């Protein structure tokens, strides 16, 4: 009985363990596509799916539409068993655009595209604390500089960039095209955008974030921060387009569409979490935000008195789509997750220093709570932009405070939904709806080996009892 138990149980346990390992192995879409094209069955279904996407863009005929959709669904179901279905891309990778093209050929919904799409990028799961450990703090770097500015962190960050060869190289590379006028245009916007993308993709976050998310106490500092991306070229235009029109334009470009989806995925606010971020990860939110810079959806600070950001667009001429337009715009302007992430970077703190909040109850429903705008008076102009230093430790250091004092600390130092009213549009809807075909959630098998071991132990006990 004992040997029979081992004979059947061990192969099953080995199978589960191998499944757990392979589940974590995810190919990038370029490699997954190459692998698929080498298999006859996969290659046939993949070509069918690509024709489906092309057919959707040119509109199916009314007579063949239903048959075509059934064939498309059949192809998608077959590909769910292949590595291509679960592939992702990496930001800044060598063949990023090609990788993203393959990804969207898999996940572009046949029913249409909506605001919130799953990110095509492999999760980074980095932390602000990782960035802080990468290089010395800016204040330490500036001990090497004779004339240090007093209180202008953004100026200090620019000087720190000049001390780093990589940062200096890529900063100069975008300053030139972004400030050089040509014919009747202010600059070469296309070259400016490309150089900005390279800057934020190639330069260490400690330096690029130091310039983009520097904490400020006065207008001179905040204005320098606002000017970081040379907005007169990269951001502003003669006219403001409608935000939904800008979104449609963004979705015609693989890079822009992907960066926008990444932003909505990683900066999703959640009022019930301690950090006000659904994913409780500030670094991933800042990475996603910076990824938008250099696309047609380039965001920037709306003024020099707050942390509110927005793309260069408004909701005029929205007609019946006004509510959807406001949802889109307010996701940028009143995003508590992003604002807390910017403040945490300025503080030199991180969300990992908190006591983990109880898991937010989420479902697979197609509606995700984005934000709730409430009218509540703020302090003096610019106060929300200032990093609180009169209370120690600020925001993300609350858990350390709890451990020292052995009392439950309050989390009210972080921004919450109720703290915004100054820049918000009152009455905006609090939900963003998605109907797009998102990638399937990865199934965790980590608990199965434990269950199998438990079952195996029970079988062994029974076997030993019978033999005795």
From Swiss-Prot:
Membrane topology category: Lipid-anchor; GPI-anchor
Subcellular location, record wording: Cell membrane; Golgi apparatus, trans-Golgi network; Endosome; Endosome, Multivesicular body
Summary of subunit composition and partner proteins: Interacts with GDNF ligand and RET: forms a 2:2:2 ternary complex composed of GDNF ligand, GFRA1 and RET receptor. Interacts with SORL1, either alone or in complex with GDNF. Interaction between SORL1 and GFRA1 leads to GFRA1 internalization, but not degradation.
Keywords: Cell membrane, Disulfide bond, Endosome, Glycoprotein, Golgi apparatus, GPI-anchor, Lipoprotein, Membrane, Receptor, Repeat, Signal
Record-level Gene Ontology MF annotations: glial cell-derived neurotrophic factor receptor activity; integrin binding; neurotrophin receptor activity; signaling receptor activity
Chief location: membrane
Glycosylation sites: 59, 347, 406
Protein name as annotated: GDNF family receptor alpha-1
Highest classification ranks of the organism: Eukaryota, Metazoa, Chordata, Craniata, Vertebrata
InterPro entries documented for this protein: GDNF/GAS1, GDNF_alpha, GDNF_rcpt, GDNF_rcpt_A1, Glial_neurotroph_fac_rcpt_a1/2
Disulfide bonds: 36-42, 154-214, 161-167, 178-192, 187-233, 216-221, 243-313, 250-256, 267-285, 277-337, 315-325
Family: Belongs to the GDNFR family.
UniProt Sequence repeat ranges: 25-113, 150-238, 239-342
């Amino acid at each position: 009985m004992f040997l029979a138990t081992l004979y059947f149980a061990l192969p099953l346990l080995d199978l589960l363990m191998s499944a757990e390992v392979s589940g974590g192995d995810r190919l990038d879409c370029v490699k997954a596509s190459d692998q698929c094209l080498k298999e006859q069955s996969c290659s046939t279904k993949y070509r069918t799916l690509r024709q489906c996407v092309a057919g959707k863009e040119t509109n199916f005929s009314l007579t063949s539409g239903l048959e075509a959709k059934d064939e498309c669904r059949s192809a998608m179901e077959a590909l769910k068993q292949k590595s291509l279905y679960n592939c992702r891309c990496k930001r800044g990778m060598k063949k990023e655009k090609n990788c993203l093209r393959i990804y969207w050929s898999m996940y572009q919904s046949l029913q249409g595209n909506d605001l919130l799409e799953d990110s095509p990028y492999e999760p980074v799961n980095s932390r602000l604390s990782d960035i802080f450990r990468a290089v010395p703090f800016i204040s330490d770097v500036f001990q090497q500089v004779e004339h240090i500015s007093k209180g202008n962190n953004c100026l200090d960050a620019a000087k720190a960039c000049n001390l780093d060869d990589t940062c200096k190289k890529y900063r100069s590379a975008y300053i030139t095209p972004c400030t050089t006028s040509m014919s009747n245009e202010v600059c070469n916007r296309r070259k400016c955008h490309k150089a900005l993308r390279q800057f934020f993709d190639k330069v260490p976050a400690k330096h690029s974030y130091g310039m983009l998310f520097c904490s400020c106490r006065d207008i001179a500092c905040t204005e320098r921060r606002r000017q970081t991306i040379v907005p007169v070229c990269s951001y502003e235009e003669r006219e403001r387009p409608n935000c939904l029109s800008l979104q449609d334009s963004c979705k015609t470009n693989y890079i822009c569409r992907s960066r926008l989806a990444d932003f909505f995925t990683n900066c999703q606010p959640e009022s019930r979490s301690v950090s006000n971020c659904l994913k409780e990860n500030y670094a991933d939110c800042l990475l996603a935000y910076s990824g938008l810079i250099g696309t047609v959806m380039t965001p920037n600070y709306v003024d020099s008195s707050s942390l509110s950001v927005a793309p260069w667009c408004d909701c005029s001429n929205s007609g019946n789509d006004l509510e959807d337009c406001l949802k889109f715009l307010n996701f940028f302007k009143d995003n508590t997750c992003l604002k807390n992430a910017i403040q945490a970077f300025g503080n030199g703190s991180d969300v990992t220093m908190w006591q983990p909040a109880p898991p937010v109850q989420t479902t697979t429903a197609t509606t995700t709570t984005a934000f709730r705008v409430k009218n509540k008076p703020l302090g003096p102009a610019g106060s929300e932009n200032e990093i609180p230093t009169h209370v120690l430790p600020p925001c993300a250091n609350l858990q350390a405070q709890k451990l020292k004092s052995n009392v439950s600390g309050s989390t009210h130092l972080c921004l919450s939904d109720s703290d915004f009213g100054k820049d918000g549009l009152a009455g905006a809807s609090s939900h963003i709806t998605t109907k797009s075909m998102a990638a399937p959630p990865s199934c965790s098998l980590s608990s199965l080996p434990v269950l199998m071991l438990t079952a195996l132990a029970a079988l062994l006990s029974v076997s030993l009892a019978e033999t005795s």
